[in-house]
Amino acid sequence: MGSRTVGWWLLAAAVVLAAAAADSGEAERAAEQHSERISGSAGDVLEDNPVGRLKVFIYDLPRKYNKKMVNKDPRCLNHMFAAEIFMHRFLLSSAVRTLNPKEADWFYTPVYTTCDLTPAGLPLPFKSPRVMRSAIQYISHKWPFWNRTDGADHFFVVPHDFGACFHYQEEKAIERGILPLLQRATLVQTFGQENHVCLKEGSITIPPYAPPQKMQAHLIPPDTPRSIFVYFRGLFYDTGNDPEGGYYARGARASLWENFKNNPLFDISTDHPPTYYEDMQRAVFCLCPLGWAPWSPRLVEAVVFGCIPVIIADDIVLPFADAIPWEEIGVFVEEKDVPKLDTILTSMPIDDILRKQRLLANPSMKQAMLFPQPAQPRDAFHQILNGLARKLPHPEGVYLQPSDKRLNWTAGPVGDLKAW
């Protein structure tokens, strides 16, 4: 790398950082008084109130499907998959809940499929299909509502890496496919990628869980200069699962490291410092590359901390894309263009950067990405309900006729058919 090239990068970055730092405090303060309006219909959708637009009936399942799992291993409450737990708790006291199933628009089955953890705290999805099948068998035998639609008016929260494909490696997730019993149900999931077998039409893509209280505790003064140009902490290689280094993240993270490990504009490392949240608030751009799956909590953290997300995940379907203007607040870089990332970011007009920061300062934008306890207006819980409300009324044909083809209860891998 020539010294003239490095000098040009540093000069360009210095201009951006100086302008962003000077304007960041002003943008944050302005956001508190007068946030920039989100353009188009997205702003209206983001602030929709779902109350009065739908009613949800919650099945009363035996505790072994939910609460006992958390009691056995409370670490589930802090995992990035914890949305399935907090969604259940939210709905129990929500104004959209109905105790009369005959007036319900939607039926919710509170089954926790991500609470089987290793000693290291990693979720094991291998029992998840059996847990889900068992829960569906239970509701189909105890109530008549599943059988009249084969689940078409039911929704399930499935926050696994690849949703209801229930595997953390893409190749095996594709091989498994979505659990056959969920083919007609609406899936609320973190995984989103266009034209992928693990994302069926009509699914609602949501953010992963990131602990709101923990992030709140690490807030720094809003007028703190953003003195870091590009920031990332995480794996570049997963040597345990991908010794060759070409499959993990489709090689995008390896490319990041090989191209920019010595670039002074890029603060990237595998180290995860105690100042991680503070550092994101000091950065202009936060890298959000795919890992095994296209999504990660970094996306939530970047939005909450006002750091422009640089999304490196081809064909990703982002959370609440009909409400959050991702194209306006983020930067999209194709995986093949990672080697050009320095040029892409240093070439961005300063006015574009400042506008993205002003939009990110909008409190509604941040709130939509979070699952706070207790729930708050316009948070991720309410965005999920808005998504369900927009699917109403259910289309013709939701109620099955005697001549209609029913779901095959014996479809899928033999191991999934074992009793749980």
UniProtKB/Swiss-Prot annotation:
Pfam families linked: Exostosin_GT47
Protein name in UniProt: Probable glucuronosyltransferase Os04g0398600
Main location: Golgi
Function in brief: Involved in the synthesis of glucuronoxylan hemicellulose in secondary cell walls.
Residues bearing glycans: 147, 408
GO biological process: cell wall organization; glucuronoxylan biosynthetic process; plant-type secondary cell wall biogenesis; protein glycosylation
Keywords attached to this entry: Cell wall biogenesis/degradation, Glycoprotein, Glycosyltransferase, Golgi apparatus, Membrane, Signal-anchor, Transferase, Transmembrane, Transmembrane helix
Ranges in the topological domain labelled Cytoplasmic: 1-4
Organism field: Oryza sativa subsp. japonica (Rice)
GO MF entry, a single one: glycosyltransferase activity
A GO-annotated cellular component: Golgi membrane
